[in-house]
């Protein structure tokens, strides 16, 4: 008896994920371009900022998922190319996404570049190696506009592959999510990831990204958003995004779980802080 495969919302996007741009069907590109153009507003409430650096193999799938957003709010798409050496810029052009080139190479610089161009009252951060379910933007904005909320974030899953079965990933994500939900009580800024993060543009422009950081610019921005209200995590499964394995270096799920528990520990789960020491090796080195 053949194994039955239950179709997931992201399966069609995986059909081009990690493939060279030359293998992406032109019908997919043209369809996405048409849908993105219909969604693009000149008077947006929400600015969707997509950052990419050498992401030819992943950006098309991300844009495909964004082109199928079902959103009641006016939105705009802004691409940022962090001076890629591959066909990233060409992909933005082919899909009809207005984009800017940021020559300084950190995620902070790229996100700040997009933030500076945002016309919407709300900015939603998008990572180009990530795929977004169809109601993601609308639901995140719904939650952000609730009283007392200054920022929103969502959870993420990894797609199954040859090294990680669906069952393995479900187990890993169950324990990881439990840890993150507890951590979110006292230190939500540590749970935020830039791939699923949104805030009010005006507040973010006042604070600015810490562009000198090699990593953690998203958590730093989240920390600064606490001045303006509460960071809300949206646990609705319709907001759970699917991403690649860039943030999961270990092939073994048990090794990944042990590494995170050993590195992060449990002590910080039960205390609050508004200050973190920067690691000396986490700064952009001037050339």
Feature annotation, model-predicted:
Residues 1-65:
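N-proximal low-complexity "stem/linker" segments adjacent to membrane-targeting elements
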Residues 57-60, 84-93, 135:
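Acidic helix N-cap motif at the loop->helix transition within catalytic regions
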Residues 65, 81-89, 130:
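A conserved acidic beta->alpha catalytic loop
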Residues 102-118:
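Glycine-rich, basic loop-to-helix element that forms the pyrophosphate-binding segment
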Residues 123:
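Short aromatic/hydrophobic "clamp" motif used to bind/position activated sugar donors
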Residues 135-166:
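Conserved donor NDP-sugar-binding/catalytic core segment of glycosyltransferases
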Residues 154-160, 168-190:
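Short, flexible, basic/aromatic active-site loop/helix in glycosyltransferases
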Residues 215-221:
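Acidic donor-binding loop at a coil-to-helix junction in glycosyltransferase catalytic cores
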């Amino acid at each position: 008896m053949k194994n039955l495969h239950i179709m997931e919302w992201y399966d069609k996007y995986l059909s081009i994920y990690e493939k060279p741009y030359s293998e992406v069907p032109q019908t997919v590109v043209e369809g996405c371009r048409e849908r993105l153009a219909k969604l693009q507003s000149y008077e947006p409430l929400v600015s969707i900022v997509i950052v990419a650096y050498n992401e030819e193999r992943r950006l098309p799938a991300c844009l495909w998922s964004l082109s199928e957003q079902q959103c009641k709010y006016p939105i705009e798409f802004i691409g940022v190319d962090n001076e890629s050496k591959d066909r990233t810029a060409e992909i933005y052009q082919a899909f009809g996404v207005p984009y800017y080139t940021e020559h300084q190479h950190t995620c902070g610089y790229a996100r700040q570049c997009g933030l500076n161009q945002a016309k919407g009252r709300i900015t939603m951060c998008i990572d180009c190696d990530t795929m977004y379910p169809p109601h993601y933007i609308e639901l995140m904005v719904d939650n952000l506009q609730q009283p007392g909320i200054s920022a929103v974030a969502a959870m993420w899953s990894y797609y199954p592959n040859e090294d990680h079965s669906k069952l393995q990933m479900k187990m890993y994500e169950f324990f990881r999510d439990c840890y993150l939900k507890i951590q979110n009580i006292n230190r939500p800024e540590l749970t935020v990831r830039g791939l699923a993060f949104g805030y009010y543009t005006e507040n973010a422009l006042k604070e600015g990204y810490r562009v000198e950081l090699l990593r953690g610019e998203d958590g730093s921005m989240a920390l600064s958003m606490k001045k303006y209200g509460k960071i809300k995590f949206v646990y609705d499964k319709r907001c759970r995004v699917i991403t690649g394995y860039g943030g999961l270096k270990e092939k073994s799920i048990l090794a990944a779980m042990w590494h995170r528990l050993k590195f992060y520990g449990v002590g910080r789960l039960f205390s609050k802080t508004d200050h973190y020491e920067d690691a000396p090796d986490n700064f952009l080195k001037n050339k």
